[in-house]
Amino acid sequence: MSSQQETNDKSNTQGHPETDPEGKTGTDTGNTEDSPPDTDNVPITDDAIMDDVMDEDVKEEDIDYSWIEDMRDEDVDAEWLFELIDECNGWPD
């Protein structure tokens, strides 16, 4: 085999995408069954937030209720407070 023929043979095997057994070509995403799922583009839901909160080991004595005492010390209009509570609970007027 001439050196020109060997050069042609080598160049024909380089630069071609690899083909998987199913005949598809493409880039490797790096995902395997053992790798964690991609969570960068997952929307955060109330359930997900609550799951995170519920996973925490929070003890009753660790919760800071001082803001309630501060509200009692302030001259707060009760109607405004009830409207705020209703709004937070999602209750309609």
UniProtKB/Swiss-Prot annotation:
Subcellular location: Virion
Record key words, sorted: Virion
Residue segments, region Disordered: 1-52
Biased composition (Polar residues): 1-16
Chief location of this protein within or outside the cell: virion
One GO cellular component term: virion component
Name recorded for this polypeptide: Protein 6
Organism, as annotated: Rice yellow stunt virus
